[in-house]
Amino acid sequence: MQAGISVPRRLEIQRASTSTPNTERKNMDTNAIETMFGRIGARVRVSGAPHPRLAGIDIQTDRYGEFFDIKVGPEEQVGYEVIDLRPDMRHLLLMARRPNAKHKFLCGHDERHWFVCAIPGGSVSSVKAAIEALQPPEVRSAVRRRVKRVKDRLRRRNAAFVRQGEWFFVPVPELTVKETLILKNEPISRGNGSKSHVCQFAYRSGGEAVYVSTRYPLGLTRDAYSRLLKRNPSARSWAWRVMRRNAAVYIRGRVWHPDHKTIVLNEWHRVMMNTEGQALGARTVVFLD
């Protein structure tokens, strides 16, 4: 596998304007960052955001397809630096340097689509380390025990796990589950409005029951749900679904999602979410099923 290419090219963005493209180009070197993303076959657009809450990195789509959309808030001072580039993997590691913080993001292509993922850990400095940092401790432990070849540790499927998007599935061949406890076509979700992955067969243990609707995608506890209904009885009609927050979940059979290739698990696997939620640059995420 090709060695990583270190690219210490810093992109300073000082008080980026949201008025005109010419003003934006005066305040930032967009050509440099476009070149770096182009090395992995991606398009990127850097522009000003009209409001601070709209600032950040996202994936957008236009008539030419998907592209990385980097928006800088009004009066925001931030420098972007590509600190590792892996054209062979179609991945790069991007750092956003602010006066009081540094946030790192893995940008790349996974199966069918481009993605951006906030990375936990201040010492991460390479694409390989970023991918490993996204593995939960239980997954890393399983990798050390079961995967001997280093190059196999970052694959989507190896002896330690099967990965689909942000979810890791770790085999638990010794698990037996009563048929009456098995759920069918069960969704698992990060809980922040993202599209659910659907599991053909699932079994869950523990966790906290929460009430979820489109207005409360992160879920409400029973007490919070009851208080809401007392304040607003019409909320009862908001198409609520009872789900479990942070339960231990096991799945087998088919797992499908519109953005990923369907996988088939022939034995029970423990479900674990990646560690993006621990990153300073990530939005709040929870585990709902």
What residues fall within each predicted segment?
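Short, Lys/Arg-enriched N-terminal segments with co-localized hydrophobic residues
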Residues: 5, 9-27
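Short Lys/Arg-enriched alpha/beta "domain-start" segment
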Residues: 28-87
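N-terminal accessory interaction module
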Residues: 65-125
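Acidic, aromatic-enriched beta-alpha/helix-loop junctions
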Residues: 71-86, 180-229
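Short acidic, Pro/Gly- and aromatic-enriched capping/linker segments at domain boundaries
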Residues: 138-163, 236-258
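Subunit-assembly interface segments of extracellular/virion macromolecular structures
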Residues: 167-169
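Short, surface-exposed, low-complexity cationic segments
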Residues: 173-202, 269-289
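Tight coil/turn sites that cap or link beta-strands
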Residues: 244-284
